[in-house]
């Protein structure tokens, strides 16, 4: 529990008590002061709740990230073993696929021939 939640609840309670005293005494200034303190306590309590929610969300996200990181090596290993089995089962097909991928990459990475800039003719 966040400190702001505790302090906010205490301020809210004190504001309610002060407002009740103002109601009993018939003092408008004490009533207004109590309502203001109660509102400030409510706001501080809500702020503490928001901080707690953010802290919980960040801890949960960190836990998910740690789990994903821990399992990523196993997933990579499984994928590598599956590819190795496919290559051993069909080496010619794997060679053709690798050659096709290399050819496609070469086409993507090659630059087109540079054309000379267009010449402008001025008619005067």
Swiss-Prot record:
Domain of life: Bacteria
Gene3D superfamilies (UniProt xref): YjbJ (1.10.1470.10)
A Pfam family it matches: CsbD
InterPro entries attached to this UniProt entry: CsbD, UPF0337_stress_rsp, YjbJ_sf
Family the entry assigns: Belongs to the UPF0337 (CsbD) family.
Protein name as it appears in the record: UPF0337 protein blr1496
Species whose genome carries this gene: Bradyrhizobium diazoefficiens (strain JCM 10833 / BCRC 13528 / IAM 13628 / NBRC 14792 / USDA 110)
């Amino acid at each position: 529990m966040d400190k702001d939640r505790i302090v906010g609840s205490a301020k809210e309670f004190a504001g309610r008590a002060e407002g009740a005293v103002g109601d009993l005494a018939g003092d408008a200034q004490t009533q207004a002061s109590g309502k203001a303190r109660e509102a400030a306590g409510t706001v501080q309590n809500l702020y503490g709740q928001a901080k707690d929610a953010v802290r919980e969300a960040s801890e949960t996200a960190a836990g998910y990230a740690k789990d994903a990181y821990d399992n990523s090596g196993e997933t990579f290993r499984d994928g590598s073993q599956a590819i190795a089995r496919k290559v051993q089962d069909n080496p010619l097909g794997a060679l053709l696929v690798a050659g096709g991928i290399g050819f496609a990459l070469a086409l993507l990475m090659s630059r087109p021939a540079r054309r000379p800039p267009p010449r402008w003719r001025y008619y005067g």
